[in-house]
């Protein structure tokens, strides 16, 4: 038995997430989903965005490329999740060939490969697309910091500056915030930043499963080997 389609009056009493759960293939919810993507606050739901892109597949004449671009920008902000690739899979190839989408795909590649200097250079050429979404720069700076913390035990100030696209007083303030909130340490000599230890930048912290095999399991192996 199919899900009953609510009237517009009934739909207005639901949240966007509930509408997606109840009527994911109902084109009548398209305006609600588009409004959700367009809001200026930093709202984000992968499920809502994927639902909207699927509905565009069924109703191609109603596709709003401005909305699609906004979805992809928000997906970039969700790095290191695979959201960008998941959304891109639902966008027709003919749409992907438009300049704004080609630029977003290039930006995604730079982020995934940690090529931050190239990313910020390309981003500067596409500010009209990226700055339409609040918090974009801050989200990418957080991702860059996360990626550095997985790769390095210590980074020179110059490397951090390139990754987060900051310098001078703004970089000083950013580092101070990370010292307070994320446990960064600034060396007195040289000013390099010591990043918190984790199992990626300090492999010795990663638990060796072989060391945790219960003794009784080992005892059972010896008769078999004999």
Curated annotation (Swiss-Prot):
InterPro entries: ARM-type_fold, CSN8_PSD8_EIF3K, eIF3k, PCI_dom, Transl_init_fac_sub12_N_euk, WH-like_DNA-bd_sf, WH_DNA-bd_sf. SUPFAM superfamilies: ARM repeat (SSF48371), Winged helix' DNA-binding domain (SSF46785). GO terms for biological process: formation of cytoplasmic translation initiation complex; regulation of translational initiation. The keyword Magnesium does not apply. GO terms for cellular component: eukaryotic 43S preinitiation complex; eukaryotic 48S preinitiation complex; eukaryotic translation initiation factor 3 complex; plasma membrane. One of its GO terms (molecular function) is RNA binding. It comes from the Eukaryota. PROSITE patterns: PCI. Keywords: Cytoplasm, Initiation factor, Protein biosynthesis. It is found in: Cytoplasm. The keyword Coiled coil does not apply. Residues 44-202 form the PCI domain. Pfam families: CSN8_PSD8_EIF3K. Belongs to the eIF-3 subunit K family. Component of the eukaryotic translation initiation factor 3 (eIF-3) complex. Component of the eukaryotic translation initiation factor 3 (eIF-3) complex, which is involved in protein synthesis of a specialized repertoire of mRNAs and, together with other initiation factors, stimulates binding of mRNA and methionyl-tRNAi to the 40S ribosome. The eIF-3 complex specifically targets and initiates translation of a subset of mRNAs involved in cell proliferation. This is Eukaryotic translation initiation factor 3 subunit K. The gene is TIF3K1.
């Amino acid at each position: 038995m199919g899900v009953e389609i609510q009237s517009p009056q009934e739909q207005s009493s639901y949240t966007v997430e509930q509408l997606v759960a109840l009527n994911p293939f109902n084109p009548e919810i398209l305006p609600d989903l588009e409004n959700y993507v367009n809001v200026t606050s930093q709202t984000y739901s992968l499920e809502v965005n994927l639902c909207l892109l699927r509905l565009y597949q069924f109703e191609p004449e109603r596709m709003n490329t401005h909305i699609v671009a906004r979805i992809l920008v928000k997906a970039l902000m969700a790095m290191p999740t695979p959201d960008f690739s998941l959304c891109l899979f639902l966008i027709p190839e003919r749409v992907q060939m438009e300049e704004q989408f080609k630029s977003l795909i290039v930006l995604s590649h730079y982020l995934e490969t940690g090529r931050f200097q190239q990313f910020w250079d390309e981003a500067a050429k596409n500010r009209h697309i990226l700055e339409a979404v609040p918090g974009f720069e801050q989200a990418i700076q957080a991702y860059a910091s996360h990626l550095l913390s997985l790769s390095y035990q210590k980074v020179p100030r110059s490397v951090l500056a390139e990754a987060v696209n900051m310098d001078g007083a703004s970089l000083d303030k950013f580092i101070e915030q990370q010292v307070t909130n994320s446990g960064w340490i600034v060396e007195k000599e040289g000013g390099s930043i010591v990043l918190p230890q984790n199992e990626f930048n300090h492999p010795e912290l990663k638990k060796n499963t072989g060391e945790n095999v219960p003794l009784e399991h080992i005892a059972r192996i010896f008769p078999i080997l004999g």
